[in-house]
């Protein structure tokens, strides 16, 4: 069974990135086992490889970090569960298929949200997990941005639990309007992070065996 490691306290993004990159190297070079990091970051905007500078609107005192993951701008901060699976897609029980990997991540999060009676949706040409809200509009509850080095995955998923959604006003997240972002709390679901973690671990083990 793949081990989940919960990093305590609010984590600096760059410190966590270094931790991820170091462990990816260990998986590649030393055959270290696969793991999943569970993180809650201090406030930060991150930009993926497809970002456009005009999508950074007003970031005040929140730092901006340019990363190597896929995607555009997003926000990380307190109340958001960030999940970093470091998996070796070259193993015999895996597939060297990035699209399949992302599909499995999507299925994992949709199944986890279903536990709370929330139906997650996929939208064509838009990465992430979406929730149907007022008047048939869709709001994003989970962002996905990954990177692979020698078929070892890192970066991952950010799910809004009790996130301050106003912080998304400083960017156009994932190239979308900030009004199209939601959280479990905004949907009327209040859950402790530790309880949410138990659910995602259970659902993970059903998909990534």
Curated annotation (Swiss-Prot):
It comes from the Bacteria. It is found in: Cytoplasm. One of its GO terms (molecular function) is lipoyl(octanoyl) transferase activity. The active site is at residue 174. It catalyses: octanoyl-[ACP] + L-lysyl-[protein] = N(6)-octanoyl-L-lysyl-[protein] + holo-[ACP] + H(+). The record marks 140 as: Lowers pKa of active site Cys. InterPro entries: aa-tRNA-synth_II/BPL/LPL, BPL_LPL_catalytic, Octanoyltransferase, Octanoyltransferase_CS. Residues 30-209 form the BPL/LPL catalytic domain. GO terms for biological process: protein modification process. Keywords: Acyltransferase, Cytoplasm, Transferase. Substrate binds at residues 69-76, 143-145, 156-158. The keyword Transferase applies. Catalyzes the transfer of endogenously produced octanoic acid from octanoyl-acyl-carrier-protein onto the lipoyl domains of lipoate-dependent enzymes. Lipoyl-ACP can also act as a substrate although octanoyl-ACP is likely to be the physiological substrate. NCBIfam families: lipB, PRK14341.1, PRK14345.1. Belongs to the LipB family. In the reaction, the free carboxyl group of octanoic acid is attached via an amide linkage to the epsilon-amino group of a specific lysine residue of lipoyl domains of lipoate-dependent enzymes. This is Octanoyltransferase. It comes from Rickettsia prowazekii (strain Madrid E). The lineage of its organism: Bacteria, Pseudomonadati, Pseudomonadota, Alphaproteobacteria, Rickettsiales.
């Amino acid at each position: 069974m793949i081990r989940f490691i919960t990093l305590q306290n609010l984590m600096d993004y760059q410190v966590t990135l270094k931790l991820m990159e170091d462990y990816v190297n260990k998986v590649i070079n030393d055959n270290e086992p696969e793991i999943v990091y569970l993180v809650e970051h201090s406030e930060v905007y991150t930009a993926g490889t497809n970002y456009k500078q005009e999508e950074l609107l007003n970031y005040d005192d929140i730092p901006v970090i340019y990363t190597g993951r896929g995607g555009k701008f997003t926000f990380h901060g307190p109340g958001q569960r960030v999940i970093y699976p470091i998996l070796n897609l070259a193993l015999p029980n895996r597939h060297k298929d990035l699209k399949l990997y992302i599909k499995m991540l999507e299925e994992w999060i949709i199944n986890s949200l279903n536990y709370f009676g929330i139906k997650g949706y996929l939208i064509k040409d838009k990465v992430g997990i979406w929730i149907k809200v007022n008047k048939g509009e869709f709001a994003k509850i989970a962002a996905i941005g990954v990177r692979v080095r020698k078929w070892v995955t890192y970066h991952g998923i950010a799910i809004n639990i009790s996130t301050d959604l106003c912080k998304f006003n400083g960017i156009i997240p994932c190239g979308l309007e900030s009004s199209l972002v939601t959280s479990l709390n905004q949907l009327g679901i209040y859950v402790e992070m530790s309880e949410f973690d138990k659910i995602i671990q259970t659902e993970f083990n059903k998909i990534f065996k």
